[in-house]
């Protein structure tokens, strides 16, 4: 009598129990802290939600970079006493004229020291500065990658929305948020760069003249809005004395008058700079500006060394929370433009789920009937293995929090057919051996061994295709690839391990005279 392999028994029991535990949250609420709580994460086409395609405005970023570079050049030229004129930023490049041709060589040294990737085109005493192609590509990739991470933090600040974020092309970002019922909220928080800066107010400027367009050199006019004064203007110094990148926390709060404010605190470096600014400018006003819009310009009454403060403004509780979220996530390196928008209602998702359930159930029942009709008791074992394979798939999807989409359901249904195909192949090989007149045990062992290589090859080639689909596909294609991969692994395990174990138990303990295959 052939002994049952204990490792197969233990492995099958452990895998099945573990799968039941992982799949349980899909059918009931689990309150135990020792058990998994995550159910299958449904995709946009099943839950409904928002679909946005974003364009990263790289030209604006590049123009800002050139403006910063121009300021750096002016400072270095002054320090090295290099005469120049007509220094302008035009079409993502810097153009200037050198007063003395002998200054071209030291000027190039300064440029190379600032950034060796800057290309200088010289025409007599005129110079055009621009980034090299490789530098532009590096900057573009950096900006898009930073934008993706900041969008993720803004959209999913609590870590519960599970958005899908993917880079498409050179400067497009695909954003899908399942279950999002308010696309306008998404557009609002993504439409703001959220660049927070602190400036000293130009106390000597004439507001009326500035509004007419006569703004002093080195200053700029910004507009504010509050409940008591309505719209108003303030002239501030262009120089940024402190940036929002030094913030560590930001949260909505209330002041002593129960007005909504945003409380913030700086990191160590920011606290030190903030302390120096407030210490050296007592009696002056410090403007807090967000995306070139004035939030507030309070008077500095004393040195603030603790590195924290509040931003007042015409805030509601909602707008204060929104601003705090934007500040925590950080400013976008470049503005984002929404070039495609789709909203999928939950009813459509529910219809898709219902259609997927019906298709899967009908397919499962049809396969079960066919297997029992064709292979009798062995067909029943194949059906049990198929049921366990579906359980394993559900458990793995829940465990890894893979997103299940409508194409993913199609992938699972496809693996059902592949699982049955493996069993059919095994049973046909067993049938061939029985026709040779060999014993039942020998026919079973030989049938599984001879079919194993074919099953492995077929599933490995499908796994390779699934891997390539996942690497090069986007959205629903990735969902199909994930479900197909999990389905193949589960179906192979159930067909080779579970089915063989069930047949061995049946043959050993019930000793059937015939397998019902001939």
From Swiss-Prot:
Chain segments annotated as transmembrane: 9-29, 361-381, 384-404, 406-426, 452-474, 486-506
Places the protein is found: Cell inner membrane
Keywords: Cell inner membrane, Cell membrane, Membrane, Protein transport, Translocation, Transmembrane, Transmembrane helix, Transport
Keyword Protein transport attributed: yes
MF (Gene Ontology): protein-transporting ATPase activity
Broad class of the protein's primary localization: membrane
Record's bilayer topology term: Multi-pass membrane protein
Complexes and interactors: Forms a complex with SecF. Part of the essential Sec protein translocation apparatus which comprises SecA, SecYEG and auxiliary proteins SecDF-YajC and YidC.
Family: Belongs to the SecD/SecF family. SecD subfamily.
Name of this chain's protein: Protein translocase subunit SecD
């Amino acid at each position: 009598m052939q002994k049952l392999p204990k490792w197969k028994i233990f492995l099958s029991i452990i895998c099945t129990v573990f799968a039941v535990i992982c799949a349980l949250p899909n059918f009931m609420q689990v309150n135990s802290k020792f058990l998994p709580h995550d159910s299958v994460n449904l995709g946009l086409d099943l839950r409904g939600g928002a679909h946005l395609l974003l364009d990263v405005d790289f030209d604006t970023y590049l123009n800002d970079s050139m403006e910063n570079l121009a300021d750096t050049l002016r400072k270095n030229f002054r320090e090295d006493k290099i005469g120049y004129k007509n220094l302008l930023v035009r079409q993502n490049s810097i153009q200037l004229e050198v007063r003395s041709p002998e200054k071209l060589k030291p000027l190039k040294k300064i440029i190379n020291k600032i950034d060796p990737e800057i290309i200088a085109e010289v025409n007599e005493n005129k110079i055009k500065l621009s980034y090299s192609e490789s530098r532009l590509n590096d900057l573009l990739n950096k900006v898009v990658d930073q934008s993706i991470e900041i969008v993720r933090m803004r959209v999913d600040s609590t870590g519960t929305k599970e958005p899908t974020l993917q880079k498409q092309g050179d400067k497009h970002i695909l954003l899908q948020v399942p279950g999002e019922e308010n696309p306008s909220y998404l557009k609002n928080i993504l439409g703001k760069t959220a660049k927070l800066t602190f400036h000293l107010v130009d106390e000597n400027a004439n507001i009326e003249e500035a509004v007419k367009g006569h703004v002093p050199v080195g200053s700029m006019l910004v507009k504010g809005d509050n409940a008591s004064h309505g719209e108003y203007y303030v002239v501030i110094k262009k120089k940024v004395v402190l940036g929002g990148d030094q913030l560590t926390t930001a949260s909505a709060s209330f002041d002593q008058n129960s007005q909504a404010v945003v409380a913030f605190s700086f990191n160590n470096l920011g606290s030190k700079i903030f302390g120096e600014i407030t210490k050296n400018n007592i009696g002056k006003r410090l403007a807090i500006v967000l995306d070139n819009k004035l939030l507030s310009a309070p008077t500095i009454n004393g040195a603030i060394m603790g590195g924290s403060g509040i931003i007042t403004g015409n805030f509601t509780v909602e707008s204060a929370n929104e601003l705090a979220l934007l500040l925590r996530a950080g400013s976008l390196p470049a503005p984002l433009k929404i070039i495609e928008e789709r909203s999928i209602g939950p009813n459509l998702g529910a219809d898709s789920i219902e259609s997927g359930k019906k298709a899967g159930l009908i397919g499962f029942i049809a396969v079960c009937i066919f297997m029992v009709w064709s292979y009798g008791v062995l067909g029943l074992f194949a059906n049990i293995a198929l049921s366990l394979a579906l359980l394993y798939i559900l458990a793995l999807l829940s465990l890894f929090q893979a997103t299940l989409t409508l194409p993913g359901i199609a992938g699972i249904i496809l693996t059902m057919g592949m699982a049955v195909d493996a069993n059919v192949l095994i049973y046909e090989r067993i049938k061939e051996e029985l026709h040779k007149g060999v014993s039942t045990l020998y026919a079973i062992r030989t049938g599984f061994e001879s079919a194993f290589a074919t099953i492995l090859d077929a599933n490995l080639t499908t796994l390779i295709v699934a891997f390539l689909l996942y690497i090069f596909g986007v959205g629903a294609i990735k969902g199909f690839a994930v479900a197909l991969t999990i389905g193949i692994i589960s179906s192979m395990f159930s067909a080779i391990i579970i089915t063989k174990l069930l047949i061995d138990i049946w043959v050993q303990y019930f000793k059937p005279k015939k397998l019902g295959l001939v």
